[in-house]
Amino acid sequence: NKVDENFIQFIDSKNRKVVDLMLSKMKEYIDVIIPRGGKNLVRKVQELSKVPIIGHLEGICHTYVDKDAELKMANKVVSNAKLRNTSICGATETIIMHKNIVKKFSNTILGNLEKNGCKIYGEKTLAKFYKGKIFRATEKDWSTEYLSSAVSVKIVNNLNEAISHINKYGTMHTDSIICLLYTSPSPRDTEV
């Protein structure tokens, strides 16, 4: 591309005074700041910056496995979305499964996660189908950013219920829907 490499600068300093100076005194020199770091840094930038920022505090991300999903693909996607790097804000924190696939999919998908050290929080209904260890999910789990090898599992009746759950508890960061058939226009296109 023909973008001048000087348009983007990386500030490699952990000195908070440098950050404070950029946030409060550099508005005429800096177009936008993209903070990368922990919640405390991002929160500080959001609260104090006089410079426009692109940032977020949390990533409560969802992966919905729809009734027409293919098991092998769903297992790969869920595994990658949760286990590739559990401590990033883009990792899946809640897996939502359509009720029609829980019996067939849960032991493969959740078993793979558990085998790789992931703690599973699920509803009472999940225990009817999943043979591994389940910790009882509470309301708090739906809005928890674990940032670790833990995941909550929600069972829903349909796509609309999945979308409602994502919209209620998610941070609109990194959500995915796994399905085999894609028809447009669909609620998948506009409601998450």
List each model region and its residues.
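Short, well-ordered beta-strand elements within core beta-sheets of diverse protein domains
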Residues: I95-M97, S148-N157, M172-I177
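Rossmann-like NAD(P) dinucleotide-binding subdomain of oxidoreductase/dehydrogenase enzymes
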Residues: N1-D68
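ALDH superfamily catalytic-core signature
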Residues: V42-S148
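Residues at or immediately preceding the N-termini of alpha-helices
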Residues: L71, N158-L159, L181
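Residue-level signal for inorganic ion chemistry
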Residues: I33, H98, A162
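Alpha-helix termination/capping residues and helix-transition junctions
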Residues: K27, C89, K168-T171
